[in-house]
């Protein structure tokens, strides 16, 4: 679903969850602040529906409501997994700083496991060539994605996964 000549960053991890459960947990950005440091997420619209708006704000005091780097996104494609096919959610980054796409892919691996792949094809808005800023951002994004997937897996292993609509 990406348009760059360079392959996007894609990191996968196996989860001991059925694909539907992994999808509910990882495709929903309202969970992401638990795994991504210094980040808060605000949403507008119906969860995991095309057109859903998400703003992730990152910075030293972002979780306390302070300003930070805003990553505005719109969900442009959503297809949940089935017992036999991969699910995909594609978020288009709308600026003002970050452009491109982020995807969450969840593929079933039997009844009780799934492979989650988080894809980032992100570059900076502005005068510099997207190919250059993709390369600059790649190590930071790779670290963020690896950490988020590791923390999510640790949460699942501990049996403490939370849901946004629960108290």
Predicted regions and their residues:
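Glycine-rich portal/gate segments that line the openings of hydrophobic small-molecule binding cavities
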Residues: 33, 43-101, 150-167
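Beta-strand/loop substructures that line and gate deep hydrophobic ligand-binding cavities in soluble
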Residues: 91-147
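Short, intrinsically disordered, mixed-charge
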Residues: 24-31, 37, 142, 146, ...
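Intrinsic-disorder/low-complexity, polar/charged segments enriched in Ser/Thr/Lys/Arg/Asp/Glu/Gln
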Residues: 6-14, 53, 70, 101, ...
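Short strand-connecting beta-turns/loops that link adjacent beta-strands
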Residues: 18, 48, 80-82, 109-113
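Extended beta-strand/beta-hairpin segments
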Residues: 8, 108, 114, 163-164
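Beta-strand elements of well-folded, non-transmembrane domains
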Residues: 17, 60-62, 122-126
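Hydrophobic ligand-binding cavity/cleft-lining segments
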Residues: 1-50
């Amino acid at each position: 679903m990406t348009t760059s000549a360079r392959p996007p960053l894609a990191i996968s991890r196996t989860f001991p969850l059925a694909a539907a459960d992994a999808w509910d947990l990882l495709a929903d950005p309202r969970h992401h602040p638990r795994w991504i440091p210094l980040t808060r997420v605000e949403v507008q619209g119906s969860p995991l529906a095309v057109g859903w708006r998400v703003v992730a704000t990152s910075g030293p005091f972002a979780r306390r409501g302070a300003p930070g780097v805003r990553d505005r996104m719109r969900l442009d494609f959503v297809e949940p997994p089935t017992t036999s096919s991969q699910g995909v959610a594609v978020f288009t980054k709308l600026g003002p700083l970050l452009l491109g796409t982020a995807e969450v892919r969840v593929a079933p691996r039997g009844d009780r496991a799934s492979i989650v792949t988080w894809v980032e094809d992100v570059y900076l808005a502005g005068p510099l060539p997207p190919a250059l800023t993709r390369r600059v951002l790649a190590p930071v994004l790779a670290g963020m994605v690896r950490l988020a997937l590791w923390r999510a897996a640790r949460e699942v292993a501990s049996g403490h996964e939370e849901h946004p609509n629960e108290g």
